[in-house]
């Protein structure tokens, strides 16, 4: 069966779904806490600083220290070290770190309408409706900041990020768990030699990313059987000098056979690439009171005789606001 990456909005019955999956399949669970603890051992960063990577709020000095980006590099490296078995569920933010090239992993999103989430929060945490709303809005802001940081997508429930989106206001936990288990057992998501190589590539890319971070650099990193491609997403005054510096650092990482550098889609923006000079976090996503979620299944998981799933309107009504 496939690796399960489960991301969820707050108060969407994630705990119950995960527990049902574990009891049914015997899967092991990897949590954000597990990944952060492993990251702390690899780096000189505290668990508090590493957990801060999952938050919409960053240190006021992050623009200069790039603490959040460095934390993400170490979180990836730590996660790669936990991938020693195929049958486990990664619950939380950490699952979104896993390379999409690992085809024997399926991404799941649990989300629900605001009314049911508020009801769950009031019941589970003895909050007022107003307190529950604020808590959910803050949590959604963290989720939006995370998907923006990783994918430049400010809607954390965007179906394009997942293989399945399950509306938990319409499903019971056991129903959702059964859907996930059934899809995780499909032949299309079984491990192959290519997908196992993708796990090795993910670790190598993480090692390169950490090596660059230690030297004050942050750029896109992709690995393919020892060949590493670095994507520069910020303009720089002397591009060739930067390319050589990045190649020199990446080339010293064990397992790297060749290094390529390319410029990304943001290269021609007006900001300038410098060490320790990174844009501030994205604004926080507001909760849309009227948003209704529908069940979606990625193309690779759709059976042959099933009609195409209705696509959710990407132009959501969510607004982005600053939390200063």
Q: Which positions does each model-derived feature cover?
A:
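Conserved sequence signature across two-component system core domains
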Residues: 287-288, 311
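Short hydrophobic/Thr-rich beta-strand motif most characteristic of the beta2 strand and flanking loop
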Residues: 305-313, 320
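Small-molecule kinase domains that catalyze NTP-dependent phosphoryl transfer to phosphate-bearing small molecules
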Residues: 129-174, 199, 203, 209-210, ...
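Conserved phosphate-donor/acceptor-positioning beta-strand/loop module used by diverse small-molecule
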Residues: 103-123
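Short acidic/polar segment at the start of the alpha1 helix of CheY-like receiver
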Residues: 290-294
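Non-catalytic signal-transmission and effector/linker regions of two-component phosphorelay proteins
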Residues: 261-283
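ATP-dependent small-molecule kinase phosphotransfer cores
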Residues: 35-90, 127
């Amino acid at each position: 069966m496939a690796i399960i990456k489960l991301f969820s909005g707050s108060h969407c019955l994630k705990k119950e779904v995960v527990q049902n999956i574990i009891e049914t399949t015997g899967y092991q669970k990897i949590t954000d806490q597990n990944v952060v603890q492993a990251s702390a051992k690899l780096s000189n960063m505290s668990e508090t600083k590493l957990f801060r990577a999952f938050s919409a709020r960053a240190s006021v000095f992050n623009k200069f220290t790039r603490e959040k980006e460095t934390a993400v590099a170490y979180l990836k490296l730590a996660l790669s070290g936990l991938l020693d078995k195929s049958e486990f569920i990664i619950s939380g933010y950490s699952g979104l770190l896993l390379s999409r090239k690992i085809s024997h992993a399926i991404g799941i999103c649990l989300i629900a309408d605001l009314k049911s989430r508020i009801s769950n929060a009031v019941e589970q945490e003895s909050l007022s409706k107003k307190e529950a709303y604020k808590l959910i809005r803050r949590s959604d802001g963290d989720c939006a900041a995370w998907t923006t940081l990783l994918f430049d997508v400010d809607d954390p429930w965007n179906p394009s990020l997942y293989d399945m989106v399950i509306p938990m206001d319409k499903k019971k936990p056991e129903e959702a768990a059964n859907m996930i288990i059934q899809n995780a057992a499909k032949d299309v998501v079984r491990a192959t030699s290519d997908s196992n190589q993708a796990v090795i590539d993910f670790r190598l890319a993480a090692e390169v990313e950490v090596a660059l971070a230690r030297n004050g650099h942050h750029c896109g990193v992709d690995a393919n059987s020892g060949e590493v491609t670095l994507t520069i997403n910020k303009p720089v005054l002397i591009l060739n000098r930067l390319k050589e510096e990045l190649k020199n650092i990446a080339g010293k990482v064990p397992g790297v056979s060749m290094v390529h550098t390319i410029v990304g889609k943001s290269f021609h923006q007006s900001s300038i690439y410098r060490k320790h000079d990174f844009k501030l976090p994205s604004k926080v996503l507001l909760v849309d009171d009227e948003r209704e979620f529908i069940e979606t299944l990625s193309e690779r998981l759709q059976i042959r005789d099933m009609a195409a799933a209705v696509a959710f309107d990407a132009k959501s009504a969510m607004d982005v606001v600053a939390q200063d």
